[in-house]
């Protein structure tokens, strides 16, 4: 799997992401600078990692979404390429128009940094095939603006089309206000594009791929991508 990890000023999770990709796929990821206008030849997966691109000025992800490299990412996605955006990466994908909606301040206006539980809503996506449908996984979050919001019609369409892949839940998989850590509409933690090839999610699966972290639940996302690309080749 040939991966490209984007690097913007203020991003700070690119090396975590590159390490996770290397551990699971066995291949080094290419680091692509925000001013580049092309992606490496043969790229299978583009990852927009977490952090605080451009200091979160204007809006989280707003400046990064207008960086030169994002034109190449939009072209890559329109051609069916796989794109993963995590945390600030999710915000950038929304600001870029690759995903609908926006990430707002957490409902309690506090930064959240801890492990959370997610329910995998379906496993017929490249981004979830490493899990079972309905499986509960534990992954970390670290965000102050992870409250996914969209108009009512958009949320209904996302749910009706099966584009909500991950939701915040209890350890037993229950969905409800008490388990919705940031107030996100419909407890949404991750959504995909209409074609299903672009995923944005707030939690950080890249930080739960090694035993030393005490949990490897994030590994399934990357393993599923590797398997998908093998079968698609």
Curated annotation (Swiss-Prot):
Database matches in PROSITE patterns: GATASE_TYPE_1
Predominant localisation class: cytoplasm
Keyword Cytoplasm: yes
One example GO MF annotation: glutaminase activity
GO BP term, pick one: 'de novo' IMP biosynthetic process
Keywords: ATP-binding, Cytoplasm, Glutamine amidotransferase, Hydrolase, Ligase, Nucleotide-binding, Purine biosynthesis
Active site: 87 (nucleophile), 204, 206
Pathway this chain belongs to: Purine metabolism; IMP biosynthesis via de novo pathway; 5-amino-1-(5-phospho-D-ribosyl)imidazole from N(2)-formyl-N(1)-(5-phospho-D-ribosyl)glycinamide: step 1/2
Family matches, as Pfam families: GATase_5
Domain annotation Glutamine amidotransferase type-1: ranges: 3-233
Subcellular location per the Swiss-Prot or TrEMBL entry: Cytoplasm
Enzyme Commission code(s) on record: 6.3.5.3, 3.5.1.2
Record-linked NCBIfam families: FGAM_synth_I, PRK03619.1
Primary role: Part of the phosphoribosylformylglycinamidine synthase complex involved in the purines biosynthetic pathway. Catalyzes the ATP-dependent conversion of formylglycinamide ribonucleotide (FGAR) and glutamine to yield formylglycinamidine ribonucleotide (FGAM) and glutamate. The FGAM synthase complex is composed of three subunits. PurQ produces an ammonia molecule by converting glutamine to glutamate. PurL transfers the ammonia molecule to FGAR to form FGAM in an ATP-dependent manner.
Subunit relationships: Part of the FGAM synthase complex composed of 1 PurL, 1 PurQ and 2 PurS subunits.
Protein name, per record: Phosphoribosylformylglycinamidine synthase subunit PurQ
Source organism of the structure: Rhodopseudomonas palustris (strain HaA2)
């Amino acid at each position: 799997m040939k991966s490209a990890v984007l690097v913007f000023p203020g991003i700070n999770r690119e090396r975590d992401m590159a390490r996770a990709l290397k551990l699971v796929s066995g291949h080094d990821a290419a680091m692509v600078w925000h001013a580049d206008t092309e992606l490496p030849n043969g790229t299978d997966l583009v990852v927009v990692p977490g952090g605080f691109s451009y200091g979160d000025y204007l809006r989280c992800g707003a400046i990064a979404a207008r960086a030169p490299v994002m034109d190449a990412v939009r072209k890559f996605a329109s051609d069916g390429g796989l794109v993963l955006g995590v945390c600030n990466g999710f915000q950038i994908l929304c600001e870029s128009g690759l995903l609908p909606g926006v990430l707002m301040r957490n409902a309690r206006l506090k930064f959240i940094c801890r492990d959370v539980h997610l329910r995998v809503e379906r496993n017929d996506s490249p981004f979830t095939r490493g899990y079972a449908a309905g499986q509960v996984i534990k992954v970390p979050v670290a965000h102050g603006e992870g409250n996914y919001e969209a108009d009512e019609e958009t949320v209904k369409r996302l749910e009706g089309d099966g584009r909500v892949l991950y939701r915040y839940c209890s350890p037993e998989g229950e969905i409800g206000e008490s388990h919705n850590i940031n107030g996100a509409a419909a407890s949404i933690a991750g959504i995909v594009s209409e074609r299903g090839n672009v995923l944005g999610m707030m939690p950080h699966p890249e930080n739960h791929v090694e035993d030393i972290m005490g949990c490897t639940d994030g590994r399934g996302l990357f393993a599923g991508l590797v398997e998908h690309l093998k079968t698609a080749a």
